[in-house]
Design a protein with these regions (language model features):
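Glycan-recognition and catalytic cores of secretory/periplasmic carbohydrate-active enzymes
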Residues: 1-122
Length: 122
């Protein structure tokens, strides 16, 4: 996976990296965003479902563990939208804003639930 190098070096995915190693310009360049992690969960489980290659299941499990530990708020529910490089929520913490609505997390969880059902039914 293209995410393999970045995930292992940075403990979670970063949204912006410059391929020429120049300074990024976007405000959120050093943040970890919720939706790329949702997409990794979906795509890795989909790849596992379709290929049965264990490396994709490992990616799925690694991403789920990271998201549960860092994005999910066990006390008040929902996921934080933005984490700092160290995996802690940005301050002030954001669970909903103009860019983070009720789409990616529910979609991810519904798709994952459906695919797990398909995998277990085989």
């Amino acid at each position: 996976l293209c995410a393999e190098k970045k995930f292992s070096n940075l403990r979670g995915l970063l949204y912006f990296t410059d391929c020429l190693k120049k300074p990024p310009e976007a405000y959120e360049h050093d943040m970890k965003l919720w939706w790329p992690h949702n997409e990794i969960m979906i795509s890795s489980l989909m790849l596992y479902r379709d290929t049965r290659d264990e490396k994709y299941l490992e990616w799925f499990e690694k991403t789920v563990a990271y998201c549960k530990e860092h994005f999910a708020d066990p006390e008040y529910g929902e996921w934080y939208g933005y984490l700092r490089r160290d995996g802690k929520p940005t301050m002030p913490a954001c669970k909903g804003c103009t860019f983070k609505g009720p789409f990616h997390v529910p979609r991810c969880l519904i798709m994952v639930d459906t695919m797990l059902g398909e995998i277990l039914a085989r």
